[in-house]
Amino acid sequence: MFHATTILAYKGKNKSVIGGDGQVSFGNTVLKGNAIKIRKLNNGKVLAGFAGSTADAFNLFDMFENLLQSSKGDLLKAAIDFSKEWRKDKYLRKLEAMMLVLDRNHIFLLSGTGDVVEPEDGQIAAIGSGGNYALSAARALAKHANLDEEELVKSSLQIAGEICIYTNTNIKTYVIEDEK
């Protein structure tokens, strides 16, 4: 498991949201508390976030963004092509990072081994050291609270930040709303 972050993605009825905390840790030391580990891709139609080695994650972001462009914004095709490229490249197989990517139709976890996983419920996924805390909170809030999608993500990450020592409560979110 990667120590240093928590990323949570939620594909709700009206919005898709990704959020992340701002903490960067090196061993037992907090280096930075306001890092941004999420991005908008494909003119804001795809959201992505990473956990793991920052340098590795930037390489993965660039590679994924290129595949997303070559697939004309088709997230499913880009995720599959990403996995194929990852498996073929010996250098990529050694990268220590994970990504969450989502749009209004799909949500995928791209693992450090080149796997592409769509969550069983198709709605909520989390990565990073506080990922399981955020995932648990998000599932409970989705089931029992009447929160807007962005508030659900923020509240879940807040809970993770209060529990996980590698996660803080400096939360940043990006949202994709249904076109009206």
Curated annotation (Swiss-Prot):
Coiled-coil region: none
InterPro entries named among the record's database cross-references: ATP-dep_Prtase_HsIV_su, Ntn_hydrolases_N, Proteasome_sua/b, Proteasome_suB-type
HAMAP family per record: HslV
List the PROSITE patterns: PROTEASOME_BETA_2
Pfam families recorded: Proteasome
The GO molecular function terms of this record are: metal ion binding; threonine-type endopeptidase activity
Q: What is this protein called?
A: ATP-dependent protease subunit HslV
